[in-house]
Amino acid sequence: MAQLICEHLSLGYEGSEILHDLNFSVDAGDYLCIVGENGSGKSTLMKAILGLLPPLAGKVRTGDGLKRNEIGYLPQQTIVQRDFPASVREIVLSGCQGRCGLRPFYNRAEKALADRNIERMGLSDLQKRCYRDLSGGQQQRVLLARALCATQKLLLLDEPVSGLDPVVTAEMYRLIESLNREGTTIVMISHDIDAAVRYASHVLHIGKTVFFGTKAAYRQSAPYRRFFEGGDAA
């Protein structure tokens, strides 16, 4: 059953349309990779899914019992984020804020959840370290642990391996794949077409031609062929 549905979705800014009449759905347990040309609207779509940008037309809705506050988000890293002066545990625990309601403090269950996700991401030895002193790959694992404190159901990942070296990139992809195998639905923006067809179950290609379907069907599609013939820059 679909957890996320986009119906006849058109997006843009100040009346200027970037995406037109987009239709796709994400079922529980899917691993959807969103690829496309630079400026094609991938990050704009992510904003709409998060409810940060109202559609020009159409709608984004959730299903299968998924609530809006059960969508975890790993944004692209910025310089300000990389230099954030807080401990690893403090940052991971902040992912539980949506669970607190009006309470000013985290309860025992929320602290235990943060500790489990710290261990899950292999960060137990780093939890007292300052976030800004970590490597790029370690920082991404911290932010992923934080997102998992918000939800175990659906994660939105915006370029999660951007700026990472090849070894750490491969490690990050394996980690995301492991989360998906354990039941977390993944929606990931990526410039890496190879990773999309290696790890994802489904691909959404946004550009002059829009494709949505399984990765097997994507390998036979015109957008995929154009990319490898050098026609598109994803």
Name each model feature, range by range.
Residues G58-N69:
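Conserved ABC transporter NBD signature motif
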Residues R108-L126:
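Conserved ABC ATPase "signature" region
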Residues C130-L134, Q138:
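Conserved ABC ATPase signature
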Residues L155-D158:
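Catalytic Walker B motif of ABC-type/P-loop ATPase nucleotide-binding domains
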Residues P166-V168:
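Helix N-cap at the start of a conserved alpha-helix in ABC-type nucleotide-binding domains
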Residues S190-H191:
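H-loop/switch region of ABC-family ATPase nucleotide-binding domains
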Residues V203-A216:
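H-loop (His-switch) and adjacent beta-strand-loop-beta switch element
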